[in-house]
Swiss-Prot record:
This is Hemagglutinin. InterPro entries: Capsid_hemagglutn (IPR008980), Hemagglutn_HA1_a/b_dom_sf (IPR013828), Hemagglutn_influenz_A/B (IPR001364). Its main location: virion. It comes from the Viruses. It is a single-pass type I membrane protein. It comes from Influenza B virus (strain B/Hong Kong/9/1989). Major glycoprotein, comprises over 80% of the envelope proteins present in virus particle. The extent of infection into host organism is determined by HA. Influenza viruses bud from the apical surface of polarized epithelial cells (e.g. bronchial epithelial cells) into lumen of lungs and are therefore usually pneumotropic. The reason is that HA is cleaved by tryptase clara which is restricted to lungs. However, HAs of H5 and H7 pantropic avian viruses subtypes can be cleaved by furin and subtilisin-type enzymes, allowing the virus to grow in other organs than lungs. The gene is HA. GO terms for cellular component: host cell plasma membrane; membrane; viral envelope; virion membrane.
Amino acid sequence: MKAIIVLLMVVTSNADRICTGITSSNSPHVVKTATQGEVNVTGVIPLTTTPTKSHFANLKGTKTRGKLCPNCLNCTDLDVALARPMCMGTIPSAKASILHEVRPVTSGCFPIMHDRTKIIQLPNLLRGYENIRLSTHNVINAERAPGGPYRLGTSGSCPNVTSRSGFFATMAWAVPRDNKTATNPLTVEVPYICTKGEDQITVWGFHSDSKTQMKNLYGDSNPQKFTSSANGVTTHYVSQIGDFPNQTEDGGLPQSGRIVVDYMVQKPGKSGTIVYQRGVLLPQKVWCASGRSKVIKGSLPLIGEADCLHEKYGGLNKSKPYYTGEHAKAIGNCPIWVKTPLKLANGTKYRPPAKLLKER
């Protein structure tokens, strides 16, 4: 019986047989795995997209601010931040803001020496707040400030709704009425006047001109000293006296003088101080700001809505979880940047089709 069984097994093993296995069509999909390197699979889902540049848009689900004051026509953001006459309007609240003025921008009314201070940063500082409003009252009585009485200087390049001459609402140009003499440093306290626990942004500065003009206006042609202090930050300045070339700002009148403008941030309940001599621009209306707004570099106008705002690509809608291309700051519901495309294998590992084998 055992011999017969062995014989049967030999006969069976020599017979033709079919080997079966997993079969599939030829696969063009290759994925790179962490453990097996490149592997052919039967199917993949792309996880990345490469965006193309588009216009900027409003961020879905939130308010987006382009210009600080959209209704202030023919006004730069610096005009609005300094409260230039004819550039005073409501700044809308926003959770996201577009930094669209990428170069230092001058403001009308008076030539500003931008390189002396951080004043060109003021519009960006304001953009970083969700809620921004200009106080209805002046922070100090400039006409009766120490060293006065003063008359408040104006510029023919700053017309307002009632007069052909004016000045920034955030500052008062303090020109001595009768006591046009040199003075030792004077100190004025700047109180906190915001009413809702906001940060108070107080703008101030000083005026410089030729020796002749300084003598005529203030009774002192020497360089003047100025200091501001608030929130633990102290800044010192010395005015520059000289014959500046006439300069015209925003189609205004030619002016030989220059102003240096700065600001200080006062926290709730905290006062600040300004120490000054002749030519001071005393603070008046202040900005009261609260909340946080995300800021991103971009351009105007804002057209439509988008899931994400990207500095290089503009408005993006999130069609894939990842993107390739230029890596830059982005805000909103944004895809994640990756260096190379990612794919999700949604099929099996590819195996060659099974073959009919004939054993001999």
